[in-house]
Amino acid sequence: MRQIKKLLTVTLVSLTVLSGCSLPGLSSSSGDGIAITSMTTTESQIVSHMSRLMIEHYSEGEIEPVMINNLGSSTIQHNALLSGDAQVSGARYTGTELTGVLNKNPESDPDVALKQTQEAFDQDFDMKFYDSYGFDNTYAFMVTRETAEEYNLETTSDLADYTDEFAVGVDTSWFNRPGDGYPAFQEAYGFSFGNIRAMQISLVYEALSTGSLDLALGYTTDGRIPAYDLVVLEDDLQFFPPYDASPFATHAVIEKYPVIDEALSRMIGTISTETMQNLNYRSDEEGIEPALVAEEFLKEHNYFEEEGE
């Protein structure tokens, strides 16, 4: 019953944002009118809470943003900012934004992808796509260590000989996505999988570790990769575009509250892929709430200290 209630809540929020209606509780009287979006992933929620805590701290409590959690896609996040229901996103990813929201071709060069994304959001939407936190959460195919050794798997191209043998699980949103999804993958690598199922990406790691799947498409920063001793296969054809993660805000809100720009900028380039993987692990495997993971990390690494202290 709890899962059903959660699903209904997420669905209601997503539909409300998509319809362009204001979300309940997000009038100018709450959080000084500042709301931060996050998606369903643990990672998105952790860094979004980091953004919230940094803004609260550096505004000396004058700004207390509210959170809009569990949005189902980057497009829904974008619509929330377009409608004015939110002003900040904790995590937006270059690869997703280019091919999804901006409807551009995938770009394999991380620097070019970031520049294109930043320029497009600035010019077309008057929004700021910041430089990266420092981690790239791209897609990658992965297997158990036993499978990698048994079939001598190191690269994605090595899978070509086992397309009908492996049970494969992939992210639901990736399965039909244009640009960098499964249709384009088949064209780039020249093969398709005979037994492939689309599923919630949070489920693929355990399914892989228990043998329900032989091969899965996952996120490179997921903490369950080391937890289950999974082997990430090299994307040898460089099909998957970079998914460098960055904070995101409207120019209107950072012009009105320059301290928001200061707070978000302090996190740029400070979180590595390995660090993010460990933070995800703390929440996904140790059961610590994303908000607490975020707060403990910021305190431990002195984000709340002024420069020069």
Label each region the model flagged:
Residues 1-8:
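Bacterial N-terminal signal peptides that target proteins for export
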Residues 17-20:
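C-terminal motif of bacterial Sec signal peptides marking the signal peptidase cleavage site
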Residues 22-25:
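Bacterial signal peptide processing site
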Residues 31-71, 134-205, 288-292:
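Bilobed "Venus flytrap"/periplasmic-binding protein-like clamshell domains
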Residues 43, 177, 188-191, 265-309:
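An extracytoplasmic/periplasmic, membrane-proximal ligand-sensing/linker region
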Residues 54, 75-86, 102-104, 183-188, ...:
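Short helices/loops that flank or line small-molecule/ion binding pockets
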Residues 100-109, 115-130, 212, 224-238:
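Ligand-binding "clamshell"
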Residues 138-149, 244-257:
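A bilobed periplasmic-binding-protein/Venus flytrap-type ligand-binding module shared by bacterial periplasmic
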